[in-house]
């Protein structure tokens, strides 16, 4: 990588660290209409857009999220702060996960913590995740700069400087992409494991399983009686 490419990476990292995010305290405590929701999201996440005309959130997106059971429906056409939290989760997750995987993650979250008496409250969950992600963001420059240094050690025997610069840039993109690919696989495996365990626990027990549980309970009761007698 030439000096210009290195400077670009440095500038990009500084920009990423300073990007706007939806802080827990930024979310309004009043309910919003759909137009107000899209405006709010666009104002707070505009720095993340790749292109100027990219849309952070549209009415169609919100309606589709509701139809696909990612987002609970509004109440009298108004969206609460809990809706904003869920929409923010969707915004980040949709860049790496399928709609079905996001649904598997968000459904348990919204069922238990969306406008319920569940503990912790959804705003507490959002705040804790936000605080952890801030720490991850602080560690990002060191990780990317490390991969940048590795890419600069590649293709050193290429004499043409323009070709060398491209190949080293390609190396950096591959290193970063491999990192994302591996983490995406880990995420999908975690979701699959959770889904399988939940399906197993939700499945009605067979007569044999019920009998086995009763037998084990009787054995445990006998063991408890023996232990009590021995103490006497």
Where are these regions (language model features)?
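Extended hydrophobic/Leu-rich segments
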Residues: 1-3, 8-16, 155-159, 166, ...
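Basic helix-turn-helix/winged-helix DNA-binding cores
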Residues: 2-112
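Intrinsically disordered, low-complexity, charge-dense segments enriched in Lys/Arg
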Residues: 108, 112-223, 227-232
């Amino acid at each position: 990588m030439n000096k210009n490419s290195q400077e670009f990476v440095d500038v990009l990292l500084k920009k990423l660290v300073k990007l706007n995010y939806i802080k827990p305290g930024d979310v309004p405590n009043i309910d919003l209409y759909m137009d107000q929701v899209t405006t709010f999201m666009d104002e707070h996440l505009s720095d993340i857009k790749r292109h100027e005309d990219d849309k952070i959130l549209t009415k169609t997106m919100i309606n589709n999220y509701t139809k696909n059971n990612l987002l609970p429906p509004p109440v009298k056409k108004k969206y609460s702060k809990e809706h904003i939290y869920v929409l923010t989760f969707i915004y980040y997750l949709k860049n790496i996960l399928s709609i079905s995987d996001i649904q598997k993650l968000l459904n348990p979250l919204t069922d238990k913590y969306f406008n319920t008496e569940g503990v912790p409250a959804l705003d507490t969950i959002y705040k804790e995740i936000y605080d952890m992600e801030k720490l991850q963001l602080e560690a990002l420059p060191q990780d990317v700069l490390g991969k940048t240094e590795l890419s600069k050690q590649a293709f050193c025997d290429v004499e043409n400087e323009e070709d060398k610069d491209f190949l080293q840039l390609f190396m950096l993109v591959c290193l970063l992409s491999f990192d994302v690919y591996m983490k995406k696989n880990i995420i999908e495996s975690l979701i699959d494991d959770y889904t399988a365990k939940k399906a197993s626990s939700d499945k009605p027990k067979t007569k044999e399983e019920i009998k086995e549980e009763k037998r084990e309970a009787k054995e445990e009761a006998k063991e408890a009686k023996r232990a009590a007698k021995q103490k006497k």
